[in-house]
Amino acid sequence: MMISRGLFGWSPPHIQPLTPVSEVSEPPESPSPYLDPGAEHGGTGTAAQADDEEEMEEPEEMEPPPAAVPFSQLFACADRFDWVLMVFGSVAAAAHGTALIVYLHYFAKIVQVLAFPTDSDHLISDDQFNRLLELSLTIVYIAGGVFISGWIEVSCWILTGERQTAVIRSKYVQVLLNQDMSFFDTYGNNGDIVSQVLSDVLLIQSALSEKVGNYIHNMATFISGLIIGFVNCWEIALITLATGPFIVAAGGISNIFLHRLAENIQDAYAEAASIAEQAVSYVRTLYAFTNETLAKYSYATSLQATLRYGILISLVQGLGLGFTYGLAICSCAMQLWIGRFFVIHHRANGGEIITALFAVILSGLGLNQAATNFYSFDQGRIAAYRLFEMISRSSSGTNQEGIILSAVQGNIEFRNVYFSYLSRPEIPILSGFYLTVPAKKAVALVGRNGSGKSSIIPLMERFYDPTLGEVLLDGENIKNLKLEWLRSQIGLVTQEPALLSLSIRENIAYGRDATLDQIEEAAKKAHAHTFISSLEKGYETQVGKTGLTLTEEQKIKLSIARAVLLDPTILLLDEVTGGLDFEAERVVQEALDLLMLGRSTIIIARRLSLIRNADYIAVMEEGQLLEMGTHDELINLGNLYAELLKCEEATKLPRRMPVRNYNDSAAFQAERDSSAGRGFQEPSSPKMAKSPSLQRGHNVFRSQELCFNSEESPNDHSPAPEKLGENGSSLDVGEKEPTIKRQDSFEMRLPELPKIDIQCPQRQKSNGSDPESPISPLLISDPQNERSHSQTFSRPLGHSDDTSASVKVAKDGQHKEPPSFWRLAQLSFPEWLYAVLGSIGAAIFGSFNPLLAYVIALVVTTYYTSKGSHLREEVDKWCLIIACMGIVTVVANFLQHFYFGIMGEKMTERVRRMMFSAMLRNEVGWYDEEENSPDTLSMRLANDATFVRAAFSNRLSIFIQDSFAVIVAILIGLLLGWRLALVALATLPVLTLSAIAQKLWLAGFSKGIQEMHRKASLVLEDAVRNIYTVVAFCAGNKVMELYRLQLQRILRQSFFHGMAIGFAFGFSQFLLFACNALLLWYTALSVDRRYMKLSTALTEYMVFSFATFALVEPFGLAPYILKRRRSLASVFEIIDRVPTIEPDDTSALSPPNVYGSIELKNIDFCYPTRPEVLVLSNFSLKVNGGQTVAVVGVSGSGKSTIISLIERYYDPVAGQVLLDGRDLKSYNLRWLRSHMGLIQQEPIIFSTTIRENIIYARHNASEAEMKEAARIANAHHFISSLPHGYDTHIGMRGVELTQGQKQRIAIARVVLKNAPILLIDEASSSIESESSRVVQEALDTLIMGNKTTILIAHRVAMMRHVDNIVVLNGGKIVEEGTHDCLAGKNGLYVRLMQPHFGKNLRRHQLI
């Protein structure tokens, strides 16, 4: 019967712990750069901070409740049709809610048939038979009413909810796009505000549609249940009400603890989530420093913090559910026991007692379910307050009705302007600023960081208004001008152009109507037409967040085309070419030069070399105009501009290279001859000196300059190979020179972790150094521990490529099918004892469902078939049995939920560790795939592991419980009457469909179209992220048009969606009642045909009615399990994936010595995500040990790819990358990367202390070594100036550092690593000139450290200490040689470096 869940199916909300029990050993000796040091009080700096925080603690004040609108205000956007829908929906919900109570009323009449007189010749009289048929037909009528009311209820509330929230969304977006820029400065324009709006609207929609209907439905059940209960037997109803608070208290107390524990466990897992997110986000850095084991340990250790919470949740859940069910069953036994007094004294019959009892129980459950909606109502009211407050907010105070100038000359004047941002009013940006821009002239604004130059463009665009002063256009204050007209006269091009998720055509024409011919003409002027035409869909190619990814150069060209199409009088350029390489910068500058002709132009520049041709240069300092004039005039003045230019030029002009200081040439010749005797030539680099000191002197040997073109190569020989053992050690027993001083293996000191088996050879240590050396001993080899020039290695064996190929064939081939049940069971096998104990509890509790129904049915039949003392004895016996079952239920629930909970927690933890460990074994190419983005992987770690738990431990618990319920119910049915049992079983498929449909409905009305809302929100998110572009090009109406179009599609879809969901839900409820009517009809038929007695038949009918949900639920779980099986498949695809580049091959080589010779031989390469684009083609490059080679080239020529191949982030498609004559594939991957130091263009800083960021390279480094590394990196001074020094927390939760400071910390990390091979990837390209100089000095010192160095550069500053320069174009070497040689060729190298040297490039010689 449908009331069975009313007695046994309700429980406090089930809260699944996010993080499980961990089984990790002792922590490492050194702190992890992933873990928050605030969590451990071992550091003095951290402890001091903690003490300060304790002193600052004040008594907590209770926060006032958040503001909320009145409930009626939720429907403020409803029109007349919405009110009609809500009225019909409410009536239908009330009718649907009373249906179960009405059925219960007729159930009493079914039981009352037992009181009819029977025919002596028949087991059932004609009156009884006809009455049962009549009642079964009545239940069919109820089923029809439920079908109609359920359909109308769901459909009406879905439709009205979508309609009302569509109006709210539209009004909100309209107001949002009309806000001034100070609003976005305050609340952010990074898309978070859109996500908040989307979630707020969903809360409102849930509150005013789904939850209102659900509330009316359950309140109707509550009211009708009380009425029916008191009408049938008010005494029983009253007593049942009196016991209700005790049952509610048991569940409520456990809920309070569960919610608190849930919050604690969320906070505990946040630390682990942060570790995982940083690890997968910065995986290249993590791999480069071979810290995979540390990351795994840190992640596992952070999961340890959730151990006690997981156990407590399982404990509280088991006890809470046990006492709730136990008290409910004992209460039922008491009501039935009291009922016998009313039956004996003829004050009520059995049907009235059972109806009163269950009607009040259902009434209480209805009230409980109705009360759960109040939380949603409160959330909806709070969300509505936030949205309605925004909707009622006045739009931008700017003038929309101003004047329009008849003709625009373009004279611009800033007159005594004072300005500060509203979000930071205490910080003055401009203070008495004056500036005049003559018509059709270009004025460049320069100055130090924080001088205020970047605020000029938003003031000119009227994103903001000055605090004091005025901005004039042709003598008219721009406040008096019509805003839309003003912005139509201004073209804006920025360094980071905004592209929206539209086609290229729509992006160029953004905010205005234009023909395709006009768009193409604008693209041609912007030098964009060629690359657009080469795309498959041309101008219809989708770009932006959801479309094709374009290069920065291409984005800027589209931005220029957009400005060209606007044909503005005034042009604003904000550091347009700052992030481009030389060739891209030249092309873009040509397009800008054309665009600037005949227009008043303001240029914001940070690189002074780009603005020498401006008509005037204005120099700003602290918000004021310091000086203004032409380039030559300002140079002659010799003030700030000259100083800034001098700083920039200092980073460009090549310096003399450091060379060895020999007392006489004979000494050098002797060493050269000695070297030749060992089978190799002296490398061209003068830094290959074996002297521990690199001193400058007067007697300098300068090697002959070499120059090669694309068809030539240096005449260098590879070092002679030597014979090696299988482990990479030399078979030569002669004298061996020790290796460079290296770090001790931190991994060797970590406790053993399950599924983490990483072995690392113990490396030798050395502490010798020359105190006389001007170069730190951290940068050079130990004099007693030099790299051996003679101990080199032969090429790899031929079969290594075959092995790699076989791995690639197997790539991602596992688990196309979901994992088997046995695979899941294997994961939980260590907790088999917990599973056994939990299964015992689940089996006992599941069996009690039909057993309790059977005993209650016996009590009810006893009311009719027994009298006097026999009735009293029988009822007492059965009620005592029910009470005992209630007590056993407490124990059974505790066993079930506590032990299955522990098993699930351990399984979740184990799967998370296995997934994280497997992720960190994959090659970098795996992370490049879209489905393996950091956000996605972090989310999968958080959620997918819980799916494994849900699919096994949770579902196993319910499956065992319901399976025993089914088995016991079938056994009871077969014992009482097998024919009726078979009919009941035949209805199971139909009831299964009903259960599935109902579960889908209970999951929420709105989920079916949430994806459409997400797509609609992308339009708004694009606009908010690029709000400056939207406002500057007056495209708010365009955004509004696109958004409304999406809303119209959603409304059309929601109508059909609502009707379909409503029909499915109504029909599912119809099937539930119709099957019950069928069962009652066959019960009457069975008795009439003398298959069984009437009392026995009705007992079996009641058993199956009570057990209906238990019989159906295992099948109802099918869609959930099938859905989760897809998630499970993805989990095991990660765990079982075989990486194409194996990091843990213990049979690979780990030689004791490294020479440092690197060769890329006949390389063909394309990225796995772009196999159609060949990045390197038949590429060859050789770098001798100790040499420094610079690689330059246009954007996309393959420069950074070289470093990725050397770090073995990727393997080439064809060819070989060799280290000391052996293919990189023959080396152990972690060993290989441990001998390389990598400095990237974007410095990666972990969210921890500066100390831990530096010692990330070598965890056993001493304090002195760490500080020495910081000094070499020019970082010690600024670190020491911070309040907490090296213990300062940086990153997401700490102090914000500049890009230059971050880069210096990254350099210090590489210095501390002291690897023999150094890889630098445009380390100073993204840093402003002033900071770039400091970073450049640190790089210079690092490069002088006697290492094999490959640097990617696009500034001449990086060419100071190079032995060879390689120029790339199209994945091939087109020029090669020294700086002077390449400068003399006047080829691509000259064109690339022209912006940095000017016309006199050839004069600069490397001396």
Curated annotation (Swiss-Prot):
Membrane topology category: Multi-pass membrane protein
Cellular compartments per GO CC: Golgi apparatus; plasma membrane; plasmodesma
Tissue specificity field: Expressed in aerial tissues.
Region feature (Disordered): 18-65, 670-696, 709-815
Highest taxon of source: Eukaryota
TM region positions: 84-104, 139-159, 212-231, 236-258, 310-330, 351-371, 840-860, 880-900, 958-978, 982-1002, 1061-1081, 1102-1122
Residue ranges annotated for the ABC transmembrane type-1 domain, each copy included: 86-379, 835-1123
UniProt keyword Membrane present: yes
An example molecular function term from Gene Ontology annotations: ABC-type transporter activity
Catalytic activity: (indol-3-yl)acetate(in) + ATP + H2O = (indol-3-yl)acetate(out) + ADP + phosphate + H(+)
Positions of ATP 2 binding: G1193, V1194, S1195, G1196, S1197, G1198, K1199, S1200
Function field: Probable auxin efflux transporter that contributes, together with ABCB20 and in a FKBP42/TWD1-dependent manner, to the regulation of leaf position and morphology, internode distribution, roots development, and inflorescence organization, probably by modulating auxin repartition.
Protein name listed in UniProt: ABC transporter B family member 6
Classification of source organism: Eukaryota, Viridiplantae, Streptophyta, Embryophyta, Tracheophyta
Underlying gene: ABCB6
